[in-house]
Amino acid sequence: SDVCSSDLPNSEYWFGTDNLGRDYWCQVWYATQVSIRLALIVAVGESILGVIIGLIWGYVRKLDRFFTELYNLIDNVPYIIYMTLIALVVGQSFTIMAVSMIAIGWLVMARRVRNMVFMFRDREYNLASRCLGTPLWRVLTKNILPYLVSVIILRMALSIPATINLESTLSYLGIGLGIETPSLGLILSKVRGFFLDYPYLLVFPASIVSIISISFYIMGNAFSDAADPRNHV
């Protein structure tokens, strides 16, 4: 079936309707909520895992080679291959996608934290703490972690739009969220045959993703600057 002229965006249907006559605004609204919820869960999950691994990776010299090799092993395989294998072997659902993204997405945060830890690891106060026998967890959480808060916040803010874009791409390709879960990628996949005749079917979801990306980037920079101890000296 095709979309008739009365189904174009109007006062009753703000985003028009799809090829089946369903309100496109409602679909995009619910799909956006699902995508944001997924992105927040993934951002928090991969940040917690990445920060813990990154702190240990950067501070404990004996484990540096192990984590470096693990990073290279995982990072050298394209992300989409992991997600395709997971979708085929494990299945497709909100929970599976969230866990999968966290299991792979911690790499970027861990690498960033590890590089920052290198800058503070051999400072005088950390050397003194080691000489005094201060527990490892206390050195990491009290002497190093406060200086990384701004980097962590910024990375989390950038992770949210990146996750939304990735989820949309995977769902559009059929290897993302299941068909029972509304998502931006799934919506675009269903109406892709009508993009040329009715470009609003593509423009509206793409605009939503762009607004979300810009908003979280601006907020992330603002919170990052506010949390940076160097800005309060």
Place the predicted regions along the sequence by residue.
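Membrane-cytosol interface at the C-terminal ends of specific transmembrane alpha-helices
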Residues: 42-43, 51, 88, 92-142, ...
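C-terminal transmembrane helix and the adjacent membrane-cytosol boundary/short C-terminal tail
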Residues: 61, 94, 103-104, 150, ...
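Generic hydrophobic transmembrane alpha-helix motif, especially the helices
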Residues: 14, 18, 58-59, 63-120
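Transmembrane alpha-helices and adjacent helix-loop boundaries
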Residues: 48-52, 60, 76-82, 93-94, ...
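Short, small-residue-biased leader/transition segments that mark boundaries at the very start
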Residues: 1-5
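Amphipathic cytosolic juxtamembrane alpha-helices at the membrane-cytosol interface
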Residues: 22-37, 62-64, 68, 121-122, ...
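Transmembrane alpha-helix signature in integral membrane proteins
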Residues: 24-59, 212
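Glycine-rich helix-loop "coupling/hinge" segments at transmembrane-helix boundaries
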Residues: 87-90, 117, 165-208
